[in-house]
Amino acid sequence: MCGIRRHKGRKTFILVKRITVKITKNIYYFFRYAYRFNLQIHTQVAPAREGGGIRPLVRKRPAAHGPRHPPEQDGPEGATARTAVRKRAKHPEKADRAETDRRKSGGNGNRIRNFSLSLVAMAGLYFHIPFCKRVCAYCDFYKSVELDRMEPLAEAMRRELEARRDYLGSEPVRTRYFGGGTPSLCPPETIGGLLARAAELFDCSAVEETTLEANPDDLTPAYLEALRRTGIDRLSIGIQSFDDACLKLMNRRHTAAQAAESVRRAREAGFGNLTIDLIFGVPGFGGDTLRRSLDTALALGPEHISAYHLTIEPATAFGRRAARGDFAPVEEEVSEAEFGLVHDTLTAAGYEHYEVSNFARPGFRARHNAAYWHGAKYLGIGPAAHSFDGRERHWNVASVTQYIGGAEPGSETLSERDRFNEYLLTRLRTAEGIGLAETEALFGAERTARIVREVRPWTETGTAEIRGGRLAVPPRRMLLSDAVIETLLET
């Protein structure tokens, strides 16, 4: 990769992260460390991720996505939960800009203006459980350690389900997801109560996947057995590493032995669909340490593995250490090598690298995640959760106190440019990429021709490919997908 490409990547990182602020936070939840994976290689020269000082290029708005919103001090614990969601007045100039965009789009203006991003006849429910026992050294998502507020929060979430019962229209709910925070701190009866209430208010007769994020040390045999009875059929276990020293550095509350045991216990309890999270790019823990973690993960045989690159955020323990000069991100070449190691190891073991951060055995792609990437409607319940009805984004306040108190959600209608950019940002993260015929039908021939024209330098180097009428970044090159996306965004 030549110096020009590296420089371009640095600019890309800044631009794409700014634009990414406009994606829903529930999408961002599943991207979680999203741009940590393919954009982190440029963190040393780029500002912090959304919620950490980034401002979107077009207009100010909340960081987009359902689960973890950075901080507002929420309670006496002072946990870092840097909130990117702010209660704000509506901006009348948005309508003027949308009309200007429509006129600029020419003959396709009306069609694009009436286009809904919801392209999939399914819907998802997301429940945000923000509580944590301990703050991880890398985490700047919205969280609270006030565990005694679990039941008042659950009651407020049940009220929100009732108030928003018409949000998804007639579309059936196909996926349900509990994210956090640490949802495995939630009693099974509370989880079951939320699912039961949702089933009374929405069409959940065809649910295909119900996921709960969990910490390894929470997964006792009794808890797992009770969890199965609630309807949870997929666990996302936040292991991060199978190295005790690395876990200690990250301030994780489990050990490597507990991590492995949690997977075995989940199998014994009857869970046949497991995904585990791993983090790479941790200074001092690459090479053989990462390889051992990957080998241990493969020996446990999860159906799905998510691998994220560590990002050092300002309002975290790692960020404070970095500010003092005693902690720094790994070098760009190290990031590239570790990404390659993850890709090569997992694909050789039969996992499909189907999205920047995600690997699955055949038939076990994350269905809830895929709904975000392909424009399905979803309803986010809980503090900091975001929702999308096909045309508008809605977001809840990132505060347990204010959420329980009934704070009104914010909302914004997507402009044509927002829709186009989000289409690129989500689809080009996947191995399938975008279909050129579909893109033309949705956004017009002129935009599609511009995509083909401007992506040519990347296709000539093999960083992107156009095959069978589809544009995609090959999985082995996904570390550079940010640069490809930046080329195509409308700013």
Where are these regions (language model features)?
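Local cysteine-cluster metal-coordination motifs and their immediate loop/turn environment
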Residues: 130-141
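A short, conserved structural fragment
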Residues: 460-469
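Short hydrophobic targeting helices and cationic amphipathic motifs
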Residues: 15, 29-31, 36-39, 97, ...
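Short amphipathic alpha-helical interaction segments
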Residues: 445-457
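C-terminal scaffold of the Radical SAM
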Residues: 122, 143-166, 171-445
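Compositionally biased, low-complexity flexible segments
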Residues: 47-107, 111
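Short, amphipathic alpha-helical interaction segments positioned at domain boundaries
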Residues: 478-491
